[in-house]
Structure formats: C-alpha cells, structure tokens
C-alpha cells in the first residue's frame, strides 16, 4: 500500500532536518523524501513529504513508533507534537495517509 507522511519540524535548520530524516529512515528504510520547504502558515518551520510502499503490518508498526496518540482513521490520521509524544522532539506535526 502506498503511503505518504507529511512532516513539519519546528525550526528551519538543515542539520535538524537531516537528523529527523535519518531517524525516519532508521524506522522505515523504504521512505523516499521530497525536497523540504518553508511551511507557509507556520513561521520558522519547514515541511516535507515521505512516501513508501508498505504492508499493513509495516504500517501498524510504523504508526506505533511515530506517535503515541493519532487522531482520525487508521489510514488517514494526524498528530501534533505539542500534546502528544512524537518520535523526535522537534517534530511539530505529522499527517499519515494511504494514497
């Protein structure tokens, strides 16, 4: 199943972006990443997308480690870092979708 993960981190910092992408790649080596860009509605934040072709079990395992409290349906959900536990302290927002 093809999945897309939208990632927003809380600082425009290339080293931080690399660290977060490295963590994501460790959790899911199948991810490919779009170029990052400044997040238009959040001052000082950057965003990018990660895509992969994953099995149902891989999706379940990944969702369990990315965040502890997703909102929404299993295959279309999101989470904010200010009120949940993210896989990295600088992740502000995640949206996970099957496409």
Q: In which residue ranges do the predicted regions lie?
A:
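Short, extreme N-terminal segment that most often corresponds to the first beta-strand
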Residues: 1-25
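Short Gly/Ser/Thr- and Asp/Glu-enriched loop/turn motifs at secondary-structure junctions
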Residues: 2, 41-43
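Charged interaction segments
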Residues: 21-32, 43-99
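N-terminal/domain-start alpha-helical segments
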Residues: 36-38
């Amino acid at each position: 199943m093809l999945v897309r993960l939208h990632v927003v981190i809380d600082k425009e910092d290339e080293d931080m972006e690399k660290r977060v992408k490295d963590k994501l790649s460790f959790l899911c080596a199948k991810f490919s990443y779009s170029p990052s860009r400044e997040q238009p509605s959040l001052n000082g934040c950057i965003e990018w997308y990660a895509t992969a072709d994953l099995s149902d079990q891989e999706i379940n395992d990944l969702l369990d480690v990315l965040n502890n409290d997703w909102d929404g349906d299993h295959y279309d959900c999101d989470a904010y870092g200010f009120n949940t536990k993210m896989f990295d302290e600088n992740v502000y927002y995640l949206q996970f979708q099957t496409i």
